[in-house]
């Protein structure tokens, strides 16, 4: 059974900047892998480390945000190439959800398909959330996909997400391949009803 995403809670890390593309999220040279395992360590690598591998000032290197599981972004996040490695790197770095103003369409789809919810807030609400987290890194942020709300401090803001994506995440139907694997016996039954030659093993 795939995980059902109803309420996601955690600390957040603010990442300012519009139109952050997938090349920045995960530099292309780190895509030469056979699996997605370990991609999290290369998240925003060129912005977090210099050519010698020394840390640079960056929100993801800031100890105040250590342990954050929600990524705050601005508009146009995930633009550029359609590489699915980008959302994989974010998820494998420990993030459970992304809150932003808007997302590139292909990135949004790739993220949803691996169980990484991307929800949008109105610019005013997002601005308040950014400032709140920057002022208080320990602030707990709550994403309620059932009631379509983001809660933090004493504030509640409506979230926006495509309804089909929200339903898939809430019902645990976000991974088509996973659904097929879980439906093994049903597929076998269907296969036996087909008129053409079928596998016998």
Curated annotation (Swiss-Prot):
Role summary: Catalyzes the isomerization between 2-isopropylmalate and 3-isopropylmalate, via the formation of 2-isopropylmaleate.
Keywords: Amino-acid biosynthesis, Branched-chain amino acid biosynthesis, Leucine biosynthesis, Lyase
Enzyme class: lyase
Subunit structure: Heterodimer of LeuC and LeuD.
Molecular function in Gene Ontology: 3-isopropylmalate dehydratase activity
Family designation: Belongs to the LeuD family. LeuD type 1 subfamily.
Record NCBIfam families: leuD, PRK01641.1
One GO CC term, this protein: 3-isopropylmalate dehydratase complex
Lineage, highest ranks first: Bacteria, Thermotogati, Deinococcota, Deinococci, Thermales
CDD domains xrefs: IPMI_Swivel
EC number(s) from the headed UniProt entry: 4.2.1.33
Catalytic activity: (2R,3S)-3-isopropylmalate = (2S)-2-isopropylmalate
GO BP terms, alphabetized: L-leucine biosynthetic process
Pathway assigned in UniProt: Amino-acid biosynthesis; L-leucine biosynthesis; L-leucine from 3-methyl-2-oxobutanoate: step 2/4
Protein name: 3-isopropylmalate dehydratase small subunit
Key word NADP present: no
Keyword DNA-binding attached: no
């Amino acid at each position: 059974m795939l995980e059902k995403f109803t309420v996601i809670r955690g600390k957040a890390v603010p990442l300012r900047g519009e139109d952050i593309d997938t090349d920045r999220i995960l530099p292309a040279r780190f895509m030469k892998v056979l699996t997605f395992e370990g991609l999290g360590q290369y998240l925003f690598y060129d912005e977090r480390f210099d050519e010698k591998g020394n840390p640079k000032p960056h929100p993801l290197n800031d100890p105040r945000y250590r342990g954050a599981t929600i990524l705050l972004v601005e508009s146009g996040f995930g633009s550029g190439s359609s590489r699915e490695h980008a959302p994989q790197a974010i998820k494998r770095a420990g993030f459970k959800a992304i809150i932003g103003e808007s997302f590139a369409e292909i990135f949004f789809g790739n993220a949803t398909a691996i169980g990484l919810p991307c929800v949008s807030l109105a610019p005013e609400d997002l601005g308040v959330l950014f400032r709140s987290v920057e002022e208080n890194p320990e602030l707990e942020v709550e994403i309620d996909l059932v009631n379509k709300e983001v809660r933090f401090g004493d504030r509640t803001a409506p979230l926006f997400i495509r309804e089909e994506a929200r339903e898939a995440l809430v019902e645990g139907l976000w991974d088509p391949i996973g659904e097929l694997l879980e439906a093994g016996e049903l597929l076998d039954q269907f296969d036996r009803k087909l008129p053409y030659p079928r596998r016998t093993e």
